[in-house]
C-alpha cells in the first residue's frame, strides 16, 4: 500500500501542476489553501456502514473509505480527521464547511452535482443483487424464476427481478422484516442493494448466507469536494488521484483488504485505465 501511495504522489502532483494555470484566474481554492495552511484534512465518512466506514472497539472510524481518506491526507502531506456523517447530512456538512472532503458511499446523481462537487472518475459502485442461503447454491439470476423472493415494499429492485427474471416478489414493510422472512424460509432470497447486502454479510450475523450473483444496474459512487472547487485545484487533484487509484489497483487492494466481494466495476476500470504497454 505504501509503495502504491508513494508512486501516486509524483503522478498526481504532476497532473495538478499541469492544470493549475488554466484555472487560476477563476478559482480561489479556499478549501485547498485552508487544508494546507492548517495541516489537516477533515473528511466526512460513514461510521455505520461496515466495511466501508464503521467504528472499531475504540470508537475510531475504519474501513475502505477511511483508508482512502488516509491515502489522500498522506499524499497531501497533512494529518487526517474523520468526521462521522450520515446520508441525511453528508452534503450539508460539505456545503457548510464542516468537512473538506466527503467519501461516504454516495451515489453520483444529477441533482447532487448541483449541490456538491462530485469527482470523476467515480471510485466505486453499487447495484442490484440478492442475499440467499449458501445451502441453496444459487448460481445465476435465472435460478430466481418462479421462486419467492423477499423485498422491501416500494424498492425498485423488486420490479427489476420480477420483470427481468420472473421472480415472485414477497414484499414487506421494511428490510428487517424481509430478512427475517428469509431466515424463516418464506423466500429463497432477499433482493436489495449489493452494498447493503455486503454490510450485512460483514456483520457476522449472516454467516450462512451469501451474495451469489454478479451485481447488475451499476449505480456509481462519487467522492466530493465543495461545489465551487470541483474544477479548481482540489477537484482536479482528487480527480487525478481517483484515476490513479483505479489504474494502480489501490481500490481493488482495499476492497480485498476489507473482505468486500470483488466487483466487476473495479476490474473494468483497472483495465480501462491501465497502461496498454505494461508487461510488454
What annotation goes with each model-predicted range?
Residues 25-26, 31, 157-172, 208-213, ...:
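Ligand-binding clefts/hinges and TM-proximal coupling segments of bilobed small-molecule sensing domains
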Residues 25-105:
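Extracytoplasmic small-molecule ligand-binding "clamshell" domains
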Residues 41-42, 78-79, 96-104, 148-149, ...:
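Alpha-to-beta junction loops
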Residues 54-57, 69-78, 141, 154-174, ...:
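Ligand-binding cleft/hinge of the Venus flytrap
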Residues 66, 81-92, 136, 154-156, ...:
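Short helix-initiation/N-cap motifs at beta->coil->alpha
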Residues 67-75, 138, 142, 147-148, ...:
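Extended ligand-binding regions for polar small-molecule ligands
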Residues 70, 74, 79-143, 208-210, ...:
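Acidic, polar ligand-binding/catalytic clefts
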Residues 124-132, 198, 202-242, 261-280:
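Periplasmic-binding protein-like
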Amino acid at each position: 500500500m505504501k509503495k502504491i501511495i508513494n508512486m501516486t504522489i509524483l503522478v498526481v502532483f504532476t497532473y495538478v501542476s499541469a492544470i493549475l494555470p488554466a484555472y487560476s484566474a477563476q478559482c480561489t481554492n479556499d478549501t485547498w489553501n485552508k487544508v494546507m495552511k492548517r495541516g489537516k484534512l477533515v473528511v466526512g465518512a460513514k461510521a455505520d456502514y461496515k466495511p466501508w466506514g464503521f467504528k472499531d472497539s475504540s470508537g475510531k472510524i475504519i474501513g475502505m473509505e477511511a483508508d482512502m481518506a488516509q491515502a489522500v491526507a498522506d499524499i497531501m502531506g497533512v494529518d487526517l480527521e474523520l468526521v462521522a456523517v450520515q446520508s441525511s447530512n453528508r452534503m450539508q456538512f460539505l456545503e457548510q464547511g464542516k468537512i473538506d472532503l466527503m467519501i461516504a458511499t454516495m451515489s453520483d446523481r444529477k441533482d447532487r452535482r448541483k449541490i456538491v462537487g462530485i469527482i470523476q472518475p467515480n471510485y466505486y459502485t453499487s447495484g442490484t443483487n440478492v442475499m440467499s442461503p449458501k445451502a441453496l447454491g444459487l448460481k445465476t439470476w435465472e435460478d430466481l424464476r418462479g421462486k419467492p423472493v423477499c423485498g422491501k415494499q416500494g424498492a425498485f429492485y423488486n420490479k427489476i427481478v420480477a420483470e427481468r427474471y420472473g421472480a415472485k416478489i414477497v414484499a414487506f414493510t421494511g428490510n428487517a422484516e424481509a430478512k427475517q422472512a428469509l431466515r424463516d424460509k418464506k423466500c429463497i432470497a432477499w433482493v436489495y442493494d449489493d452494498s447493503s447486502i455486503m454490510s450485512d454479510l460483514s456483520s457476522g450475523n449472516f454467516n450462512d448466507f451469501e451474495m451469489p450473483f454478479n451485481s447488475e444496474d451499476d449505480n456509481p459512487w462519487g467522492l466530493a469536494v465543495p461545489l465551487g472547487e470541483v474544477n479548481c485545484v482540489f477537484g482536479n487533484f482528487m480527480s487525478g488521484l481517483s484515476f490513479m487509484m483505479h489504474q494502480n489497483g489501490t481500490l481493488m487492494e482495499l476492497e480485498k483488504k476489507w473482505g468486500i466481494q470483488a466487483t466487476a466495476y473495479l476490474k473494468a476500470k483497472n483495465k480501462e485505465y491501465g497502461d496498454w504497454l505494461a508487461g510488454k
